[in-house]
């Protein structure tokens, strides 16, 4: 029986030492699904609401007791007795109880914890791994990792405008081999930084955060690390950026290396980098409400460059439909806590893939050891995954889960490889 008999919630710590919500759902079969909710540093204005307590005397106002209590007192009584396998129905109940567009009543952190824990309990009842429970027999492709090895922006206080400089390994049509390549490049980069007398301390997502003279210097460092590690830039390792441009947008211009530039000038920089470097993906290249620049950049670069909307779309089908109508962007970043339920996440991914958008499953800068997104990346047939650098346990946990899934799939498993960007 998949009848839900217990829903428990608690306050735990995320990777930044901030409180977050953890939920456990247990069924009559004795199976328990546990989910911990992540939290972002650079968040989109259109994201679902993360409910914090605001009590400055406790965790500096960042406690989540209100969300935890909402799970216990408002959600649990409504779903105990229901079948855990009725995911769509349960997610609808969660939204109905909340009653707001952005889930500000119960908190998206409360709702998501329950939604994911229900799915994990149901998967165990069905004796299936989560990726197979979510995706069925078609869940067989491993995503390409976008590895954030150099941090800037809101993730590091080091003078770099761009938030994430990433390497993208596509080696031997193998996830495991690509992960190995990324790891070797990461350690090679560390040696290069140390030799230059630069800091090898890491930021929130495990990438290095040295003080550099320019954004372009960061790109050059990545190119050197790729070559020194024995790989071929533009052949089996590529580059990707998360600009997080909303953080830089002020009064119609973008803060850039100590000054301000126009959207047209910023687009020109991206185009010049695309010619000089093996750059395959730019995330949030423009601010979340700078639709004109998104449309212009997609028209000029969209045929050859992946242009990911994160703050632009916030995993929300309504925002994504706006982008499709305007022809803004060509790829969707998928963050489950931006929308708040597994069902709505599926709807956003399905809408994107039907319209030939690439989909990229993503962590948040405030993560936990929960590996759910690795299973969801495979289960939802996402082309790529973002889960940080090659250190910090909350990041490597997801990479390791994908190794297990690749092993579990055996000969049926396929790696998206370069096809992830076509």
UniProtKB/Swiss-Prot annotation:
Binds a second Mg(2+) ion via substrate during catalysis. Gene3D superfamilies: Enolase-like C-terminal domain (3.20.20.120), Enolase-like, N-terminal domain (3.30.390.10). It is found in: Cytoplasm; Secreted; Cell surface. InterPro entries: Enolase, Enolase-like_C_sf, Enolase-like_N, Enolase_C, Enolase_CS, Enolase_N. GO terms for molecular function: magnesium ion binding; phosphopyruvate hydratase activity. It is an enzyme of class 4 (lyase). The active site is at 205 (proton donor), 335 (proton acceptor). (2R)-2-phosphoglycerate binds at residues 163, 335, 364-365, 386. GO terms for cellular component: cell surface; extracellular region; phosphopyruvate hydratase complex. The keyword Magnesium applies. It holds the Pfam family Enolase_N. SUPFAM superfamilies: Enolase C-terminal domain-like, Enolase N-terminal domain-like. Mg(2+) binds at residues 242, 283, 310. Its main location: cytoplasm. Keywords: Cytoplasm, Glycolysis, Lyase, Magnesium, Metal-binding, Secreted. The keyword Metal-binding applies. It catalyses: (2R)-2-phosphoglycerate = phosphoenolpyruvate + H2O. Its cofactor is Mg(2+). Its EC number is 4.2.1.11. GO terms for biological process: glycolytic process. Pathway: Carbohydrate degradation; glycolysis; pyruvate from D-glyceraldehyde 3-phosphate: step 4/5. It comes from the Bacteria. Belongs to the enolase family. This is Enolase. The gene is eno.
């Amino acid at each position: 029986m998949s009848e839900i008999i217990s829903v428990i919630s608690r306050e735990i710590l995320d990777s930044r030492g901030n409180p977050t919500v953890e939920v456990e759902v247990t069924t009559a079969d004795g199976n328990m699904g546990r989910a911990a909710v992540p939290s972002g540093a650079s968040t989109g204005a259109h994201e679902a609401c993360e409910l914090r307590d605001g009590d400055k005397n406790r965790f500096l106002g960042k406690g989540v007791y209100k969300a935890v209590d909402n799970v216990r007192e408002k959600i649990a009584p409504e779903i105990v007795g229901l079948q855990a396998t009725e995911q769509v129905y349960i997610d609808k109940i969660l939204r109905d109880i909340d009653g707001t567009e952005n889930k500000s009543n119960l908190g998206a952190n409360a709702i998501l914890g329950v939604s994911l824990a229900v799915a994990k309990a149901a998967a165990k009842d069905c004796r299936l791994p989560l990726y197979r429970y979510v995706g069925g027999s078609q869940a067989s492709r491993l995503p390409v990792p976008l590895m954030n090895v150099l941090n800037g922006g809101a993730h590091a206080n080091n003078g770099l405008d761009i938030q994430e400089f990433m390497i993208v390994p596509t080696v031997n049509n193998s996830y495991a081999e690509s992960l190995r390549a990324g790891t070797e490049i990461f350690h090679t980069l560390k040696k290069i930084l140390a030799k230059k007398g630069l800091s090898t301390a890491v930021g929130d997502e495990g990438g290095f955060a040295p003080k550099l003279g320019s954004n372009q210097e960061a790109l050059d460092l990545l190119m050197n690390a790729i070559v020194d590690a024995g790989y071929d830039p533009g052949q089996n390792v590529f580059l990707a950026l998360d600009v997080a441009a909303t953080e830089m947008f002020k009064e119609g211009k973008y803060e850039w290396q100590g000054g301000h530039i126009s959207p047209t000038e910023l687009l020109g920089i991206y185009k010049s980098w695309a010619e000089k470097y093996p750059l395959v993906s730019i995330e949030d290249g423009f601010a979340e409400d700078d639709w004109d620049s998104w449309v212009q950049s997609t028209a000029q670069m969209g045929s050859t460059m992946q242009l990911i909307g994160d703050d632009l779309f916030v995993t929300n089908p309504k925002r994504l439909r706006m982008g499709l109508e305007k022809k803004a962007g060509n790829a969707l970043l998928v963050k489950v806590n931006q929308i708040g339920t597994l069902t709505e996440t599926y709807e956003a991914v399905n809408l994107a893939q039907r319209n030939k958008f690439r989909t990229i499953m993503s962590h948040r800068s405030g993560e936990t050891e929960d590996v759910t997104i690795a299973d969801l990346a495979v289960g939802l047939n996402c082309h790529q995954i973002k889960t940080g650098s090659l250190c910090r346990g909350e990041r490597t946990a997801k990479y390791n889960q994908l190794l297990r899934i690749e092993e579990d799939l055996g000969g049926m498993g396929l790696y998206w490889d370069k096809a992830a960007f076509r």
